[in-house]
Amino acid sequence: MERDIDIWLVGNTGLRSPNRIQEGFRIYAESPFVGNFRGRDNEIGFMNLLNERGIIHNEAGKDASGSHARKWRLMFAKNGLIYPQLKKADGSQAELGALDAITPFGRTFLAADTYPAMQECFLRAMSVEQFPLAGGSYFSPLRWTLALMLELERR
């Protein structure tokens, strides 16, 4: 069975500016939500913290569900900054790392003190992202994009 690849999935977390990510992640790293990022109360708490610090602008009553926090959690996990929740079929959470705890790569990202250093972290995160395809192979959006660019340059 063939499945169309939705290339818009690349980095689609609902965050429109990567320049806010490090500041938002620093707020997470210094918060009581590290490793405690699940559940409505914690999601709303982190969302409110982001709002108080000016990272997001949640108009009063606009988002009462904590969806902003879930977008940030997804982005942190997709970029390897925190340990994602594993499905049992994918292995042991304990072997990977504590759920929503900051990864060594997350610490590297926090330590990035220049714009090029942050860009290198983003590039590293994009270089390992892969999506499973039918037949057991994988699709890498970055590698596909680079291959396409090289082919266009060759022509």
Protein language model regions, located:
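Donor-sugar nucleotide-binding helix/loop cap in glycosyltransferases
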Residues: 1-155
